[in-house]
Amino acid sequence: MIDRTILPPVSEISNLKLQPIQQFTLCNGITMNIVNRCDADVCKIVLLWNGGKYDVNSKYGLSLMTSLLLNGTTQHTSDQITELFDFYGSKVSCTCDNHFTKFSLKALNRTLPDLLPLVLEILQHATFPENELSAKARKLYASESMQRKTVQFQSANLCKTLFFPPQHPAITDDNIEDIKNITQDDIIAIYNDVIKGVKPEIYLAGNITQEVLSILKATFENLQTGKAGQKQRIVPILQDVKTQTKKLFMPNQVQSSLDIAIPIGNCSESDYYKLRPTTVALGGYFGSRLNKIIREKKGLTYGIRASIVNTLEGKVICINSQCAGKNADEVIEEIIRQINILKTESISNKELTSVRRYYLSALSNTSESIFSTLDYYISCYTVGVPLNSFAEREKTIHNLTAEDITTAAKTYFNTNKMLAAIAGDIKE
């Protein structure tokens, strides 16, 4: 009988293992990446194309193209496509981010012979009906209009202007009225450039038997792509910056939004693996410095978070929070104070243990399921991180010392390069 009055022992996480990834190239030059684990007869298929919102002439056009991709082909209507995927109990989506467009299918292995021909048809013969385009455009316009009224959107956008070079797509103020003028021909042109014009990188996870692999190979070897297509436009973030704060007055807002960025610059892999838990100690979890002082002790915000944003343009330490407009400057001052303390005072063994346990717990989520492992490998590909980074991160956190955290904070938490943006009911 278990004595439930006694706390169970705490087990330290160690020896995390990721299922290895295998790669091979199809006869048409497309690379397939496979993570094979026989948990159940289900698989996830992800196709990634170079080309995202920063790379195309119209980010709204790309957003509409991805939302319309499943809404009709030369052989099937939108309703028929929806019914077929639902009938076979599958989940399908198409999305885009800054530099990639993604098509994802999760399905039972036994349904693949019925679903993959439809997938190939969607990727090669989508029609983008005009009536569907009109409905999606209205929905996108309403969503973008609403988003622009939020303090979170405005502060994030304002902060980007401080570390992205002028004319970078990240800070170009697209006119949402352009959404109303996007035509079917515009959508088809983007479809031809991104989906049909670029060889995708294919990722597979699940119980990938020889039978399943044969079906997948036979399908995607018939995927025809052009030699030319959408290219990625990578413009590095600014490194030679000096601390500054920009404010945007938005009247009648209950909360103000605060975004802080510190460009990292040249950071070796070994330093990066130490900087991540250092950022966790500062503001990466509920028991972090910023949460304990700014949220719990001073009550200046409901929540605050620090993280490292890793992109193809470069790495940035980001701190995000919402607070009353009158408290925004005080929050920034306290953030700087906590950074300086982290630089000058060694953290205790108790705090280091808390950071290590939280960090390892987050790492363990990556290996929890075959699909989370696949997502990890995809994220490595999309931000240019080595595939062995998982093992290196685990090794680093087990060997991390208080001195490592102090050194990382001194080296990369450069408050002389701190860029802050505040949007809300504040004085400019």
Predicted regions and their residues:
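Short amphipathic
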Residues: 22-25, 242-250, 421-422
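Charge-rich, well-structured scaffold segments of protease-associated domains
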Residues: 1-6, 25, 80-230, 266, ...
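A generic structural signal for beta-strand entry/edge sites
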Residues: 21, 42, 100-102, 255-257, ...
